[in-house]
């Protein structure tokens, strides 16, 4: 059970404190006009947000370790640059109509966008710093009709009156086709070799059967809440059971063996017992990150930096893997 504490009235009412089912607490702070200024997680670490006083757009985010990201906008509230905690900057330029015309990635790569229609926001071409050019054509409804890559290879696309893609035609004459029912659900795909895969649905729109080109059928059955309870593939059937919270608690394989799952009050997986009887356990910190897992005689610890980024893991005290 969660308990929410609010402040403010009417449109300025905000959740400022949340007591979670495990007893942990997270908090949020807002300014006088209801804009988020800070969030404190269950471990007591605070992330600060600095909104522009006029537009409300976020101009700066400072994480608990003091690292900051900055965001800059033009007078149309479009993002023009962003600088990450590492100091690398992303930049964007726009034309008089507010359309993106150039984007510079943090690594310095530049992409330019060209437009041939003053009334369209869809580019007709993109060009990178090496001069490689890709072109696109669009329908008046914004559907992609053709794409030409930097080598001149052309791919064309067909759509139905509802905007759904019905065919892809490649330059060498190979085509792929798609068909839909009256509800817009995909019911058939024919590949470039002419092989067709068909799809069937129940009244709720859930995919129930996939019929392969060779006629083999894979099926799925659902409960009244739309959760898959049984799947059949290649003549082999597997079933799933759920608890009252909708979490998978038991899987039964085609040979009748079982895998069971247990969760904590925050819906985090804490134990998995396989069909062979082997049990794996998982432990999380206050913010929900996996910090320890146990698999028979193996104990794995997961380590993070102050920005919650995974840095390394150890197995039985020995470093097994590192990330940078």
Go through the PLM ranges and name each one:
Residues 1-20, 24-41, 45-63, 67-84, ...:
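Beta-strand elements of repeat-based all-beta scaffolds
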